[in-house]
Amino acid sequence: MIGAAYAQLSAVSYGVGDFVGGVAARRVAALRVMLVSYPIAAVLLGVLAISAGGPVRSGAVLWGSLYGISQAIGVWWFYAALGAGPISVVSPLAAVLNAAVPVAAGVAFGERPGQTACVGVVLAMLAVFLVGRESPDDEDVRTHRFTRKVAWLTIGAGVAFGLDFVLLHQAPVECRLWPLFFARVSATVLVFAVARATGNFQLPSKIPLRLAVAAALLDSCANIAMLMALHAWLLSLASMLISLYPAATVV
């Protein structure tokens, strides 16, 4: 199915993007990485939205903006958790929450996947946890402990990521890529405001800068593929397949 293909493309792009962003966040503050990646993604998605056409409706602005804010918060907290805590714990916990929220929302909205699909969802949930795990590295665990702060950052990031699917799923189909453009614009405004308030309003340089640019390109690809998957498939199934993105991060 075309929805499954889009979901797989989104998962791979998100997974590689998270790895790139996580590496950059271990060199500089997560917000400094996002100061580069988000504006670039906003410009790119704006150009693509104009090319794709489609009307600009209030639903695209509203749901796109809410999605962008939720994703910005999730990425900020996730990068912060990866930078401060053990990846072998942070990644699988965030991934499971990321998968559980949209599945629960889909069922609440009235989606009723078939029996085979339900079994697949359960197995996929287990797979999400397993692929998100890494073999504990003694040095990583010793220098990056799973503190209470890291735990809350991880939980918050997982829930925010899960809400991303739910919010974007509400955007009007006929608006095409416009919800993604408004998402990146709202997220960029939020990131700039928080970065200035926290003293992180400084662009990275050298390797972190290049990694941030790469993360922007991967993020744009992942978002477009996710939007297509959510329009072509059930929320509960598309979100579950996309939630397998930690497999690409680990590989």
Stretches with model-predicted labels:
Residues L45-P55, P102-A117, V159-E174, L218-S236:
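Hydrophobic alpha-helical transmembrane segments in multi-pass integral membrane proteins
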Residues P39-L45, L93-V107, S186-L190, A222-M226, ...:
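Alpha-helical transmembrane segments of compact multi-pass small-molecule transporters, enriched
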Residues Y14-G15, A41, Y67-V75, N98, ...:
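Transmembrane alpha-helical core positions of polytopic small-molecule transporters
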Residues R26-V33, W77-L93, R112, P172-P179, ...:
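Structural motif at transmembrane-helix junctions in multi-pass transporters
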Residues M1-V12, V20-G21, A25-L31, V36-S65, ...:
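Membrane-interface interhelical linkers
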Residues I69-G74, L123-E134, S186-V194, L244-V251:
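Alpha-helical transmembrane segments and their membrane-interface exit regions
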Residues I40-L45, A100-V103, T116-S135:
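Hydrophobic transmembrane alpha-helices of multi-pass small-molecule transport proteins
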Residues L9, V36, L66, V90-A94, ...:
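Hydrophobic core positions of alpha-helical segments in small-molecule transporters
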